[in-house]
Amino acid sequence: EDEAWWQEAVTAARGSLVLILSGHFGNWELLVFAHGMRGHPVHMVHRAMANPRVDRWLHDLRARAGTRMLGKGTAAGGVLGVLHERGLLVLPIDQNSTRRLGVFVDFFGVPASTNSGMARIALRAGAPVVPAFIVREGWRARHRVRVLPLIEVERSGDLEADVQRATQRFTAV
């Protein structure tokens, strides 16, 4: 669904990285799977599950859909690789973050430490940011991918202020 927004993002990327803004909303694993099955190379930053068997099972399932996993602790090097591969990078930003990796933004009226990685990557790489979510329809196992309008990241020359502003805009989606 919303193919026009998707095409706008791909065109804006001019063959480079596209950042997919998402969160742990609905069956977000299906969102990643759907993009991979449509032939778009997908990369995803993830935190290993506490249970190694479950972690391996999820890793294998994601790999079958063409998803390349970037471990949270080693993601920086992987993101540089994605820049060269011109793929999609999916970053769910809705998890609590450390002071070192995040910035505090308003989340439903409450200050919340939010990972600023997407804002930093968008600002440094000039990559378009596309909000995308998956929504279940009714009681059947039917889902619809919702792609929202591209978010332009503003650059003022003050990197930290730009990161703060962009992260707040992403969180508001």
Q: Across the structure, where does each feature detected by a protein language model lie?
A:
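Catalytic core of membrane glycerolipid acyltransferases/transacylases, capturing the structured
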Residues: 16-73, 96-106, 136, 140
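Non-catalytic C-terminal accessory region of glycerolipid acyltransferases
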Residues: 3, 12-14, 37, 41, ...
